[in-house]
Amino acid sequence: DDTNDAERLSVDPVMRQVVGGRAVDHRAASTSQMARVETEVLTQPQNLSALIALPGKWIDCVRLAKPIKKLILDLDSSVSETYGQQEGSAYNGYFRCECYHPVFCFNQDGDVEATLLRNGNVASAHDWRVVLVPVIDRYRDLDVAKLFRGDAAFAIPELYEMLEAEVPVRYPLARERGPAS
């Protein structure tokens, strides 16, 4: 399904320029070629690792050209509603739907530093380390004020103990509201 537009885009002049190479004068990749890339090339472990690291590498390039004065990392989960029998999709009682429950780490400019697609029935803070630790590692030696934000789901001792031990990071965390008085 991810390659639905490949045939139409394979003859698009702008897409052919973006792809480059033979595509400039001929067609860009067909649906079957795109499907092979997705299933045979992108799923190789080294390629998955490269794809996961790509947003950070891009942000690092921008940061070299335009240094930042402070770093704000914002960790948050979201809902991605699903339909049909998609692998990993599950009912989430909080969102009241069949979904995936991805977690994102954004920076102060709203750029996605890292993300992880998760099953729909996991808790909001599930696998926070997988997303946050590589981002913190990238910024460890950067000499700027660092702030971490997260909602109540991330107000867990393991997370803020790691922040205190690893790097000097301030962290206002939201607390769940109690019943209204």
What are the functions of these language-model segments?
Residues 164-181:
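Catalytic or ion-translocation cores adjacent to nucleophile or general acid/base/metal-coordination motifs
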